[in-house]
Amino acid sequence: MPAIVEKVLRAGEGRVVKRLHRVAEQVNALESDFEAMNDEELRGETVRFRERLAAGETLDDLLPEAFAVVREAARRTLGQRHFDVQLMGGAALHQGNIAEMRTGEGKTLVATLPAYLNALSGKGVHVITVNDFLAEYQSELMGRVYRFLGLTSACILSRMRPDERREAYAADITYGTNNEFGFDYLRDNMAWSTAEMVQRGHNFAIVDEVDSILIDEARTPLIISGPSDSPTKWYGEFAKIARRLTVDVDYEVDEKKRTIGILEAGIEKVEDLLGIENLYESVNTPLIGFLNNAVKAKELFKRDKDYVVSPNDEVLIVDEHTGRILAGRRYNEGMHQAIEAKEGVPIQNENQTLATITLQNFFRMYDKLAGMTGTAMTEAAEFHQTYKLGVVPIPTNRPAVRVDQPDLVYKNEQAKFAAVVEDIAEHHAAGQPVLVGTTSVEKSEYLSTLLTKAGVEHTVLNAKQHEREASIVAMAGRKGAVTVATNMAGRGTDIILGGNAEFLAVQAMRDKGLDPDETPEDYEAAWPEVLEQAQASVKAEHDEVRDLGGLYVLGTERHESRRIDNQLRGRSGRQGDPGESRFYLSLTDDLMRLFNAALVESFLTRTGIPEDVPIESKMVSRAIQSAQGQVEGRNFEIRKNVLKYDDVLNRQREVIYAERRKVLEGEDLHLQIRHFIDDVVTAYVTEATARGFGEDWDLDELFEALRSLYPVSVTPEEVVEAAGGRGNLTVERLLEEMRADAQACYDAREQELGETVVRDLERRVVLSVLDRKWREHLYEMDYLQEGIGLRAMAQRDPLVEYQREGYQLFGAMTEAIKEESVGYLFSLQVQPAAQAGAAATPPGFGAPPVRQQLQYSAPTAEGDVEVHAGDAAATDADTGNRAQRRANQRQQREV
């Protein structure tokens, strides 16, 4: 089905490209006009553009002139002039599309065009990159263009304080990673005052490497979580038990689906080891999760592939898509603790979700979204379906001359790597730079050992050397360089033949102590000479490497996604340079073993094929394509499923966050609180009068319940007497009496404390209760989703059931917010400001919760990111029926 959709989406490609080409021609026609201007006149165009916008013109009206201004500014500040194809890419981005541009076509420079144009509105532009280094590097380099034209630019980094973040978001153009933008959104919706909030809206986002961020990383939501009180001792116990269980005897493993199942023999063995009679008895239910995680940690999570153990005994996740270490991130649902127990390192506490959103729903909040990548067309259907984004392939500035050699397939991994080492040594001896792609830290280190034995000097780039990533990649195109890398080499930094002059120049400026923000004038004055020196140092080597055939890219294994293979290939042959690529495969590679086991078995049993001779077979090539198609289809379904369930929560989140923002922005809650009182009293009375008539109702019990809510000023006898006897007492009469009594008591409360104090108390109470109840609701929704799949066994649609029960839970939460807010407002002991000499500060509501260590789950490899700041979780969740909750609330409100 996606293939058919893809064909339909590509049908109008030619017309779109022609339209974009006409835009480039319009810009070219204006070029000489802006070339003739001096710097001051060119800078003044920004003011004139803004005046024209204020007068009613649109951004589309300004596009040709604005693009021409940016092109001229880039030529003067960076020494770079936008090519026509870059103008076309910029126009595609402005129109809210994904521009598919080959590696080396200058996507970073392309982003300056729509970023400048859309920043003229004053609403801000966000440029999203894949890591902090690229965000800082691009902001620093392209910021010179923006500053020249009178705009401000900034960068959001993980180490920044809230006040620095707020200042960065106030800039016209803000660079940062998807995680930083997403977590700031969640933190803003956990803030206790508008002064703590840092973002100013979501106007226009340009996502660099858009397929990596919106596709690869979209399977796992962003989650902020805080420590829970779950015990850690069981992880160690079950790690020992898992070591005593045998695969295919006590449990079974499905590597393809990454699932495990405990068999009957295993259950009996676990029960014997624990000394219990029935593992599935309700009291033992939590132990099942510990058991499953322990076996998963043993069988499905491999050291130096899925994670590494640092020298200080910390388990660090390795990003499955990029090969980078995810510093501080942690698997959720107890998985990380199970791995820590397996490795025998200190076990850290589990976490409770405080705020969450998927990347899909975060980016769909932007008024306009656009993206750039070298590999988007294979996912055009998903981009259109999920984000309503079109994919526009932009022509290359120069014809691509890279030669993609056919795959070489060997019977086993040993023979494959022997051939790989031989091929690398041959190209290295000739002086041709070689980039070798591997799929894991383990494989990169294995190949490094083989190359060392063969006497081939090389550099390894994997999760363990991530801090040197940019410098290694930037120099990977130098003569004779051999770089062994995991997927991380596929993103961000260009591999330029002879070396990256811009990278060298930026590094040299930093070495001189020059900063574009601290010393902008000195920076601008020194830049041309430093850049010229860097360019001269690499030019001669560039020509020499070009004559040797350019960069040779060698892949040691096919990835699960065709895009990642294409990204690796795309490192070579940039800007019309020569290049070559080839993949070496074996029949025992994970992709073949898991998805085409029968074919692998048939080839392995053939005795006539020598191990050191590659297999040439169209059947093998088709099998590889089929396997990648299966994985891509499966991952697409996972992402769609994540989004379907989050859409349910997203609607609830929008309601809660909107209410929360009203409170923060100072909306008068007086009328809302009055409605709360009526609603809660109505609920109490309705529950007490659900059966029978006036003579049957237990008014004493009702009044006792109401007294736990507010100081009731009437008695049951007075109400009955006013009605003319029990027989005349109706539900409507009782409701009218009790609502009036509650409202009168609140009037007295307001008169006692003063209107100003009560308004402040209302804001603090509602905010605190809303936050706590929302956290409890997230926990309940998580719990609901965990088991909802079992409804399919009863012929029920799990999603429909999740929507139905989620709606019920949300309704119960809103009622609980009303009930607790009313109870606190009546019961909290408040010292009036006149007596205290300061603003009223009710205990527990006078300030935000104590700040504590939080966990941040990022959208890759199902991990969590740890950041040492954040709002603490409020008091524990209330449990039980309404009567039990009332008792708990009374205890909480005692001062």
Swiss-Prot record:
One Gene Ontology term from the biological process aspect of the record = protein targeting
* A GO cellular component entry from the record: cytosol
Q: Where is this region: Disordered?
A: 838-895
Listed as disulfide-bonded, the cysteine pairs are: none
Please list the reactions this protein catalyses.
Answer: ATP + H2O + cellular proteinSide 1 = ADP + phosphate + cellular proteinSide 2
Keywords attached to this Swiss-Prot or TrEMBL record, sorted alphabetically, are:
ATP-binding, Cell membrane, Cytoplasm, Membrane, Nucleotide-binding, Protein transport, Translocase, Translocation, Transport
Please tell me where ATP binds in this chain.
86, 104-108, 494
Catalytic activity, EC = 7.4.2.8
**Membrane association type:** Peripheral membrane protein
Subcellular location per the Swiss-Prot or TrEMBL entry: Cell membrane; Cytoplasm
Question: Principal place where this protein is found?
Answer: membrane
The record's listing under PANTHER family reads: CHLOROPLAST PROTEIN-TRANSPORTING ATPASE, SECA INNER MEMBRANE COMPONENT OF SEC PROTEIN SECRETION SYSTEM
What is the protein's quaternary organization?
A: Monomer and homodimer. Part of the essential Sec protein translocation apparatus which comprises SecA, SecYEG and auxiliary proteins SecDF. Other proteins may also be involved.
Report the protein name in the record.
Protein translocase subunit SecA
Q: Which organism is it from?
A: Kineococcus radiotolerans (strain ATCC BAA-149 / DSM 14245 / SRS30216)
| Lineage, top ranks | Bacteria, Bacillati, Actinomycetota, Actinomycetes, Kineosporiales
